[in-house]
Amino acid sequence: MPSDIEIARAATLKPIAQVAEKLGIPDDALHNYGKHIAKIDHGYIAGLESRKPGKLVLVTAISPTPAGEGKTTTTVGLGDALNRIGEKTMICLREPSLGPCFGMKGGAAGGGKAQVVPMEQINLHFTGDFHAITSAHSLAAALIDNHVYWANELNIDVRRIHWRRVVDMNDRALRAITQSLGGVANGFPREDGFDITVASEVMAVFCLAKDLADLEERLGRIVIAETRDRKLVTLKDVKATGAMTVLLKDALQPNLVQTLEGNPALIHGGPFANIAHGCNSVIATRAGLRLADYTVTEAGFGADLGAEKFLDIKCRQAGLTPSAVVVVATIRALKMHGGVDKKNLGAENIDALEKGFANLARHVTNLRGFGLPVVVGVNHFHADTEAEHAKLKELCRERLDVEAITCRHWAEGGAGAEELARAVVKLSQAEPAPIRHAYETESRLTDKIRAIATKLYGAADIQIETKAAGKLATFEKDGYGHLPICMAKTQYSFSTDPTLMGAPEGHIVGVRDVRLSAGAGFVVAICGEIMTMPGLPRVPAADTIRLDANGQIDGLF
């Protein structure tokens, strides 16, 4: 089968106006970025709120492995399949970050015959949203240091400036820096550092804001420093929010593209799920629900991270409730969770599959704990055997009382996921019940962290370092105790040890730091060795990305 990029280039794309027409979006509501990408105007989006929303379908997955699960591919394939069986469906995805594109992961627009296109533009600069978010964040950083330089009327303590800088690249050398060296004219020297753009609170605010007014209000709430007498300083205090909103105005309009089968997809916002809340924008999701009968969206990494945050943060803030949840699994990944080395995954191994099934079982059980109907989508790989698929379906049926459906959308497009689509429609017929959240907002911040760790991760308890515990107490004293928790931890395990696969129990979840994201409306708990600025691997994907003799990109996929 051709590579993903070859398949994408061979596709005949519809003019974006034709894709919009399927949804009833008029030409004057589109801001075109070439022939195949458009932003949907703020005014048109606002006018959709009076419409009755359709059904929301969440796609999540088992704990990811290097063997790959294909969550985005399944999201796209399911959206195409729902359209094929006559259900008007919108797909809502996150925008890819440049860092992972050039690092370990490569592109992030689906794969095989279940892709969103134009793939190269989506994976690289797209419509410039990440540039706008990086610029707005950088403007705030410049205004903070400028305020300190010119008299410091707010009495900001330069030892307690919490606002780090960002860049949309994996660059470990920037994690800790010293700035303002070179003399008096350059300001006051202090320690600083960079995070990747997708970890910026501006990105989180961007993705949780309902509209421009809400965006500006949330930006104003962001706590960026403390004074010498330990009072909190916000972006509103340094008069940053108006100019930042101007930089983000056009970016906040969701991006409309299409699948290989010509179906609509909104791709907007892109916070990571291991160091942020991992969901596309509220604006895009709400627009999708009002433009289509079904909206299929994904949450990053495994259900312990992306889905939990989708339900406990995004749904809580935006008033959303999924009608059905698809948990993506592969035979290969489950065998890896069962102890098989990656180089041996092509061989049939029923025993390892059954052992690794514990990972899928915990994710499904956790999601049912939220009160949600679940179906398992088994992403088919050519080396899988019929016996392995039969065993997985048997395990799901007998141990979980859940249906597992083999999907071949990577090879066949939407036609390969029609059985999954019909199962989703069946699950979605009942009126969704209120979500049973992992914790109550009135609980103490420490108790919320403990609830996530013990209920969802299988931990015996949590261990919060002294400095982090003191910060949590301060957050509660300052009136932020009601906020939900955003866990920042490895995506590869239920624990904080990325090598502990399967479904570990009795471990301790260590919290080494916490950060207040008052604008986004959550508290980040940083666990284990997770970094908010990733590094590149020994052999980054960038090593093989180039332009060929015809000026086309080679190696992105």
UniProtKB/Swiss-Prot annotation:
Report the record's Gene Ontology biological process terms.
Answer: tetrahydrofolate interconversion
Q: Which residues bind ATP?
A: T65, P66, A67, G68, E69, G70, K71, T72
The question of whether Nucleotide-binding is a record keyword is answered with yes
According to its UniProt record, what is one Pfam family this protein matches? FTHFS
UniProt entry tagged with the keyword ATP-binding: yes
| The reaction(s) this protein catalyses | (6S)-5,6,7,8-tetrahydrofolate + formate + ATP = (6R)-10-formyltetrahydrofolate + ADP + phosphate
Quote the EC number: 6.3.4.3
Q: Highest taxon of the source?
A: Bacteria
Q: What class of enzyme is it?
A: ligase
- Name the SUPFAM superfamilies on file: P-loop containing nucleoside triphosphate hydrolases
UniProt keyword terms in alphabetical order: ATP-binding, Ligase, Nucleotide-binding, One-carbon metabolism
Pathway field of the UniProt record reads: One-carbon metabolism; tetrahydrofolate interconversion
GO MF term set: ATP binding; formate-tetrahydrofolate ligase activity
Protein family per UniProt: Belongs to the formate--tetrahydrofolate ligase family.
**The protein, known as:** Formate--tetrahydrofolate ligase
Q: Which organism is it from?
A: Methylobacterium radiotolerans (strain ATCC 27329 / DSM 1819 / JCM 2831 / NBRC 15690 / NCIMB 10815 / 0-1)
Q: Which lineage?
A: Bacteria, Pseudomonadati, Pseudomonadota, Alphaproteobacteria, Hyphomicrobiales
